[in-house]
Amino acid sequence: MRKLIGRGGPFVLTGAFVLSGLLMAPLIAITQTAERSRTQGLKETDKFVKAGGNTSEAVGTAKLQTQKTLDAYNALVTQPSKNMKGDYKKLMKSMDSMNDQAAEAGRKVDQMQQAGDIYFTGRAETIKNIQDPQLQDRAKQRLVDSQKDFGGVIESLREGAKALEPFRKQLSDQITYLGSDLTPSAMASLKPNAEQFNARGSELFAKTDKAIATANAYFQGLRSAES
């Protein structure tokens, strides 16, 4: 037994008190670790969901810009132009924006993949802290299912971007072709392929829209309910 002097007078520090403090310290540390783990998991989820939203938006923007470029191309090729040079300059500007947006979409998909790796690794670590075996198995299965769904999401986005790439390059080639011979006869020479080219574009745009919708639904399911 030890007697300590404080401002309010002496108080006794018993062995039981010391033992209680020693036992409580690990419990407090475990609680703090669990709290940090839970908070970190929420942060990682938020970052993952945000990365998914940014990716869907970037892919959608790239698709819309490709559509705008195709529309500008169609207007120049299929309709008489009173200002051929001016319209072509606008088309070139639209094409440059299309290429920039496509590159940005590719970067966002890669960033989403990285965020997914961090999210799923952290989630797997958190599951290890579940003591109930049945509950832990259920959490593991949900993790596996979520990873599988995410694999489908990212694959569909990559496939959508991959499918648009040759179309975008072909569109760029035809725009360059016009630039080398900016005459009414050159435009007329492209008209026979315009309808088929546009039909192909519509099919690819629809495929991209479907991929974006799938991604949005997946990430919406990961959002925490907010009061």
Please tell me what each predicted stretch does.
Residues A29-D100:
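Immediate post-signal-peptide N-terminus of mature secreted/exported proteins
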Residues K43, K50, N83-G86, K90-K93, ...:
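A structural signal for alpha-helical segments
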Residues V59, T66-N83, M95, A102, ...:
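Secondary-structure edge/capping motif, primarily at the C-terminal ends of alpha-helices
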Residues K108-K191:
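Extended amphipathic alpha-helical interaction segments
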Residues G52-T66, M95-M98, A102-G116, F150, ...:
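Long amphipathic alpha-helices with heptad-repeat character
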Residues K43, K47, R158-S227:
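Long amphipathic all-alpha helical oligomerization modules
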Residues V12-A25:
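Bacterial N-terminal signal peptides
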Residues M1-R7:
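N-terminal secretory signal peptides that target proteins for export/translocation
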